[in-house]
């Protein structure tokens, strides 16, 4: 096929990089869902069939023993199902809608766990839940993001401190006694100042923290609820990851030993566990994004069509290596423009929302940070922050972790 309009290559380079990454992730998620469905179907379907057969046998035996029709028995069982939805159990349970029970319910709402053991049944309650959840879930997500920002900052500070101690020990006593040259001292200072922890170290630390919290919480639930330890560990993951099936729910019995202490421990463990797992999920998402970037680089094919080299690639496009110098020049120009804009803002001009929304990937966390810096009189640095990599302009938690880890740094 002849080249039309200068190029006819159907390579990955003609796509926007973010769109290519999004489509590849969507495809991988679909494949992941299909594989998961196959595994769970193979594991759980035989058990489901066996349970249905046993239930049919029990109904038949019960109707024959007490001379009842199956229709009457099924109607009675439907009434029990309705009572079960309302929170009524054969064994006595705690009140669902007293203040303590309602507090537990709203906690599962705003944290998006949603166990399902308690649901509003009145029209007024359902309408109120819509507006209450809209604000509460948004505020809780913001809380999780702020927690993530702080825990990443603390971990990065500790790891950097350990790295500096290790580097100072490597220098040795002989080098410490000698007066180092100015160039070597400046070079070493710049190297330490630009060091950032690896995402894998952060992921390992968060993983260990999540495991410790889950194991301690499982021990408490196993003792208080009478669950097997493995079932308690399963409940912790379902609750902390906000999956919230509702097949196992803590703090539902009417009476517990040391009831006040158990309720406080239950609240603290769920709060801490959700924060840890949320942070761990977001760090794992960086690793997944790295894999996607690696796959995109593997799929890059250079374009040899005549006249293609005269075109300027779009920003964020996956382009061959010999064309990236032009994109770097464009980025430097953007840095100068950003610097001029910062100068105008610092000179007392009003902050224009158009300046923030000019970029097509401004998220809430970055916008809040920029507004705070402008209000406090601290302009954002335009030299390095204007540079782009695969993680620049991330949304939500990715935006918070941008340039905080080695893998998300613009200097890597």
UniProtKB/Swiss-Prot annotation:
Query: What keywords were assigned to this record?
Result: Cell membrane, Ion channel, Ion transport, Membrane, Metal-binding, Potassium, Potassium channel, Potassium transport, Transmembrane, Transmembrane helix, Transport, Voltage-gated channel
* Record GO biological process: potassium ion transmembrane transport; regulation of excitatory synapse pruning; regulation of NLRP3 inflammasome complex assembly; regulation of resting membrane potential
- Predominant location category: membrane
Q: Which residue intervals make up region (Disordered)? A: 374-395
GO cellular component: a single term: plasma membrane
Q: Which SUPFAM superfamilies match?
A: Voltage-gated potassium channels
Give GO terms: molecular function aspect only.
identical protein binding; metal ion binding; outward rectifier potassium channel activity; potassium ion leak channel activity; protein heterodimerization activity
Intramembrane segments per UniProt: 97-117, 229-249
Keyword Transmembrane tagged:
yes
Which stretches of sequence are listed as region Selectivity filter 1? 112-117
Q: Where are the transmembrane segments?
A: 22-42, 127-147, 199-219, 268-288
Q: Where in the cell is it found?
A: Cell membrane
Listed binding positions for K(+) 4 are: 112, 242
* Reactions mediated catalytically: K(+)(in) = K(+)(out)
Task performed by this protein: K(+) channel that conducts outward rectifying tonic currents potentiated by purinergic signals. Homo- and heterodimerizes to form functional channels with distinct regulatory and gating properties. Contributes most of K(+) currents at the plasma membrane of resting microglia. Maintains a depolarized membrane potential required for proper ramified microglia morphology and phagocytosis, selectively mediating microglial pruning of presynaptic compartments at hippocampal excitatory synapses.
**The protein, known as:** Potassium channel, subfamily K, member 13
């Amino acid at each position: 096929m002849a080249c039309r309009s200068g190029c006819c290559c159907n390579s990955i380079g003609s796509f926007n990089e973010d769109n290519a990454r999004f489509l590849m992730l969507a495809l991988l998620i679909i494949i992941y869902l299909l594989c998961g469905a196959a595994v769970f179907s193979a594991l759980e379907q035989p058990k489901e069939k066996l349970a249905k057969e046993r239930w049919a046998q029990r109904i038949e035996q019960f109707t024959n023993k007490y001379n009842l029709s199956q229709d009457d028995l099924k109607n009675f069982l439907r009434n029990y199902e309705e009572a079960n939805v309302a929170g009524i159990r054969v064994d006595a349970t705690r009140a669902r809608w007293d203040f303590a029970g309602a507090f537990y319910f709203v906690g599962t709402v705003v944290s998006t766990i949603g166990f399902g053991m308690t649901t509003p049944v009145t029209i007024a309650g359902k309408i109120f839940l819509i507006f209450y959840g809209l604000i509460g879930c948004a505020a809780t997500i913001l809380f999780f993001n702020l927690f993530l920002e702080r825990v990443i900052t603390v971990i990065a500070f500790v790891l950097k401190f350990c790295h500096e101690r290790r580097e100072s020990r490597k220098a040795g006593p002989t080098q410490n006694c000698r007066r180092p040259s100015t160039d070597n001292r400046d070079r070493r200072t710049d190297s330490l100042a630009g060091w950032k922890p690896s995402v894998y170290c952060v992921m390992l630390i968060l993983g260990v923290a999540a495991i410790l919290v889950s194991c301690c919480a499982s021990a408490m639930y196993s003792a208080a609820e009478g669950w097997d330890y493995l079932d308690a560990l399963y409940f912790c993951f379902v609750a902390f990851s906000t999956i919230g099936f509702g097949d196992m729910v803590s703090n539902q019995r009417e009476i517990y030993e040391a009831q006040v202490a158990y309720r406080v421990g239950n609240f603290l463990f769920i709060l801490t566990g959700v924060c840890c797992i949320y942070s761990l999920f977001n760090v794992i998402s960086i690793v997944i994004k790295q894999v996607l970037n690696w796959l995109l680089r593997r799929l890059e094919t250079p374009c040899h069509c005549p006249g293609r080299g005269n075109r300027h690639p779009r920003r964020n496009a996956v382009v061959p290596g010999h064309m990236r110098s032009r994109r770097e020049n464009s980025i430097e120009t953007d840095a100068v423009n950003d610097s001029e804009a910062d100068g105008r803002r610092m000179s007392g001009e009003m902050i224009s929302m158009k300046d923030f929304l000019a970029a097509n990937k401004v998220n809430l966390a970055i916008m809040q940070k920029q507004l705070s810096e402008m209000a406090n009189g601290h302009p954002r640095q335009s030299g390095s922050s204007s540079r782009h990599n695969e993680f620049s302009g991330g949304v939500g938690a990715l935006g918070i972790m941008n340039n905080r880890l080695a893998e998300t740094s613009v200097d890597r």
